[in-house]
Amino acid sequence: MTHQNKKNTWIHAAAGTGLLLGTALAIAADVPPDEPASETIAASIPSVTVTATRRSASLQSVPIAVSVVDGEQLERSNRTAIDTVVQEIPSATFRQQGGNKDSTIFVRGIGTISTSPGVEPTVSTVVDGVVYARPGQATLDLLDIERIEVLRGPQGTLFGKNASSGVLNIVSRAPSAQPGGFADVSWYQGDEKRVRAGVNGSLKPGVVRASVVAAYADYDGNVDNIHAGGSKVNGYERKGTRARVDITPNADTDISLIADWLKADSSPVQTAYQQSSAGFAQALLPVVAGPENRRVNADIAPVIEDVNKGLSAQINWRHNGYAYTSITAVRDWDNTQYTSGNAIGNSAEVARVTSAYPASRDIGTVDFRQVSQELRVASPRIDVGGHAVDYVSGLYYLHGKDAEVYRRIVTTATSVNSGRADYGVTNDSYAAFGEGTVALAQDWRAILGARWTRDELDYRHARTSTQATAFAGVQPATQSSGETARNGWSGRLGLQHDLGATANTYATYSRGYKGPAYNVFFNMLPRDTNALDPETSNSFEVGVKSSAFNRRLTVNLAAFHTEYDNYQANFYDTVAGAVVTRLINAGKVSTRGIEADIAARPTPQWTLNAALAYVDARIDDFKCPAAAAASCSLNGKTLPFSPKFKAYLRANYAVPLPNGLQADFNADYNYQTKTQFDLFQSPLAVQGAYGIVNAAVELSSSEGGWRVALVGKNLADRSYATNLIVNSGYVNRTVPRDDRRYVGITARKEF
C-alpha cells in the first residue's frame, strides 16, 4: 500500500469510527439517569446557541462544522485579538509577517497570503453581520464579544460575501435591559496593561436599550532594540470604543445601531533566527542569530498605525411568521506602516550595510472604505407538497475603494535609491443567495443551497524610481490600469439524519467560489496586469453531533475532503537579488482531515474540553509562472501554515467556598506538530512541534459581582516562531507575545 493510500485509509477509517461513536452516544443518551434531576441539571453542559445558519439554533443541531469560543473565556485567558484566539481553534491558524496589512487567517490549511487590495480573503470575517472586505481589518481588539464562531468549509450560500474556506463570525454582546456596568483591569509581566469599562441599560424601558464599552491596552514589547537610544519593540498600544443602541418600537420590529472606533499602534519586528553567511553574522553584531534571539539593532524602530471605524444598522421585522432583515454598514480602515526589510538596519544606518546586505526602509499608507447592504428573509416552516420546508434567502451588495501609496528606500555603503508606487482598487460585488431545508421524513432532512455572484474589479498603478533598471527590491518605473467582471456560482447539497433524540449525522457537498483578483502591489510588472481567474472549490463533509449522559458529554466530529482549482497563492520571486512576492493562480491544491470537539461535565465542579484537528493540506498540481526565478517542483508538498495535527485541551475545577465565594482552577494546553512556513519547502522555514501550557487561579463572588485571577502563560517557557522568513543568507523569526513564560493578574467588578 502506498503512503498516500495509507493516509486515505486512515482518514476513512477514522471517519467511520467517529460515526459509530456518535451512534453509540445516541444509544447511551436514551439510558435513564440514576441520579436526581437537580444534580443532573447542575452538572450538564450549557447549551450553545449559534447563528451559523443565519437563524439562532443550537450548536448541536446545525449541519455545519462549527467551533465556538466564549467571549468571557477569551477575556480571562488574555486572548484579546484574532492571532491569539486561533490558539483555541485547531482547524485555524494565523499568519502575520509585518503589519496588519500582511495578515491572513487559515482554515483547514487554506488561506490567501497577499497584501494586494485586488484579492479577497479565502476566510471571510463577519462582525455583527457585517463582512470585513480586507483581511487587515480583522486584526481588531476584541472589545465586547459574546462569542466567536468559526465555520469550517465553504459558506457562500448563507453569508453575504462568499468564503471558499470558512467564516470567522464574531458576535458582540447586546445591551441589557437592567442598568449596570463593569470595569476590569489586567497587568502582566513585561508591563502589559489592559483597562476596560462599560455601562448599559434601558434609556426607555421596553423600547430603547444601550451600551458603551471602552478599552485601553499597552505593551512595550518582548524584543530589545539594542541600538543607541533604542527601547523595547514588538509591542502595541490600542484604544477603542464600541457603542450599541437596540430599539424595539413594537413587538414585530427590532433595530440595532452600532458604532465602533479602534486605534492601534504596534511595533512588530522579525529577529534573526539563523544565519549561513559570515558576512551577515558580522553585519549583525552585536546581535547573534538564534532560535531564541529576542534582540534587534535597528536605528529606526518599525511602527504600524491602524484606525478601524464603522457604523452599521440592522433592522429585523417579523410578519406572518417570516423574519425580514436589513443590514446597512459603512467602514473605514486607515493603515500606515514604517517597516524595515532587513535585519541589520534601516535607511539611516550605513555603517553596517554592504552591497550583499543593503538596508531597506518601507513607508506605506492604506486608505480603504467599504459600503455594504444585505437584505435577507427567513421563512417559517411551511408545507410544500406534504413536506415541511424552511429557508433563508437574501441579496447582497458590497462596494470597496482602496487607495495606497508605498515607498521603498534602499541604502548601501555607496548610494541611496528609492521607488514609489501609487495604486488603488475599486470593487463592486453583487450576490443572490439562499439555503433551504426539506423534511423528507420525521428524522431525515435535505439541505439545498445556491448562490450567484458577480464581481466587478478595476485597478490603477503607477511606479516611479530613481534608477532606470531594477535594484534591490525595486523594479523600474511603470504604469498600468485594468478592469474585469466575472459571474460565479456556489452551492450546497446535503442530508441530515437524526440518530436519536440527542444525536444527528449529516453529509454535505459544497462548492466554493472566490472571485477574480488583480495582483496590485508595489513591484507590480506588466506580467501582473492580467486578472487572476476565480478560485473554486469542491468540498465533501460528513459529521456527527451528539450528546449523552444527560448532556454531561457532547461529541462533535467531522471528516472532510476539499479540492481547490486556480488556487490564488503568493509566489516568491527575486528582484535584483532581493526576495519579493507576487500573486498567481497556483493550480490545484487539496485538504482533507478529521476534526473533533468534545466537552464533558463529569461532576458539577469539573468541566473538560478538547478540540482536535488532523489536517493534511497539500499541493496537487502547481503551475509555475513564466520566467520564474525559483524552482516549482512542488507537487505533493505541504501547504504553508498548516500543521498536520493540532490540539487544544482545557480543564476547569470550581470549588464553592463559604460566604458565596467560589474558587476556579483552570489550565489549558495547545499543541501542534511541525509547521512549514515556506511554499517552496525550505528546510530552514520549519517550526518543530511544540506545546504551550497556561493556567489560572480565580476567586469570585457572584453576589458581590467581582472576580480576581492570577494567570500564568507559557508556563513551560517554550520559545517558538509564528512565522519564519527565509532570505539570502539568513532567516528571520516572528516572535509571539507568549514566546516566554509570564504571569499576570486580572480583576473585574460589576455594578
Label for each model-derived stretch:
Residues D246-N250, V377, A388-D390, Y396-L398, ...:
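Structural signature of Gram-negative outer-membrane beta-barrels, strongest in the C-terminal barrel
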